[in-house]
Structures are given as structure tokens and as C-alpha cells.
């Protein structure tokens, strides 16, 4: 069984036991979170259901790898180098369930 969930403005294809990195969630480590925004669920056939719930455990609150931003204008001696590290939450999917 797999599901497509949406969190942080992005969509993720998940199944039970998968580990994903999402935008930062306000939750402590080892806390269980429920994701109610489920786009679709599939057991054998595709089912778009609005009453599905995905339960996940927060493994870690950390920062992602650094992204380098480099701006340059040729022949003008203009160079700017900047870096950014995004806050992320690492989740383990524990359960995908359909509520009635």
C-alpha cells in the first residue's frame, strides 16, 4: 500500500517504513505526527480518498546540506557568493489508514 501526501507545499510518494525529508514541522523528536492531507491511496488500484490518514514518527530535526548561491556579471568585477541551509524534519512512515 502506498500514498501520496502533501506537506510543506510538496508532494511525496510514501509507503509503510519509508523515510522521507520534509520541510520543518513543529514537533519534537520521537513524537508521532498525523498527516491529513493525503492526495491518493493505492492498495491494488488507485483510490483518491479524502478521509485517509498517514501516521509518521519524527526521527530527527536538522538542517539540510548547504546550497551555494553564486551571482556574477561578466566584465564588471561583480561576484557574490552566498549559502543557505534549510531546516528539515526526517520522518519514518508508520501507518497508512483509511478512515470510514
From Swiss-Prot:
This protein binds to 23S rRNA in the presence of protein L20. The keyword Nuclease does not apply. It comes from the Bacteria. Part of the 50S ribosomal subunit. Contacts protein L20. This is Large ribosomal subunit protein bL21. The keyword Ion transport does not apply. One of its GO terms (cellular component) is ribosome. GO terms for molecular function: rRNA binding; structural constituent of ribosome. It holds the Pfam family Ribosomal_L21p. Belongs to the bacterial ribosomal protein bL21 family. Transmembrane segments: none annotated. Coiled coil: none annotated. The lineage of its organism: Bacteria, Pseudomonadati, Pseudomonadota, Alphaproteobacteria, Rickettsiales. SUPFAM superfamilies: L21p-like (SSF141091). HAMAP family: Ribosomal_bL21. GO terms for biological process: translation. Keywords: Ribonucleoprotein, Ribosomal protein, RNA-binding, rRNA-binding. InterPro entries: bL21-like, bL21-like_sf, Ribosomal_bL21, Ribosomal_bL21_CS.
Amino acid at each position: 500500500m502506498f500514498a501520496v501526501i502533501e506537506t510543506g507545499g510538496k508532494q511525496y510518494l510514501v509507503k509503510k517504513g519509508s523515510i522521507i525529508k520534509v520541510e520543518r514541522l513543529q514537533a519534537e523528536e520521537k513524537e508521532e505526527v498525523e498527516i491529513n492531507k493525503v492526495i491518493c491511496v493505492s492498495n491494488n488500484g488507485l483510490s483518491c480518498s479524502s478521509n485517509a490518514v498517514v501516521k509518521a514518527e519524527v526521527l530527527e530535526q536538522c538542517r539540510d546540506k548547504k546550497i551555494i548561491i553564486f551571482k556574477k556579471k561578466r566584465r564588471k568585477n561583480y561576484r557574490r557568493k552566498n549559502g543557505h541551509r534549510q531546516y528539515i524534519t526526517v520522518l519514518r512512515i508508520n501507518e497508512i489508514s483509511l478512515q470510514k
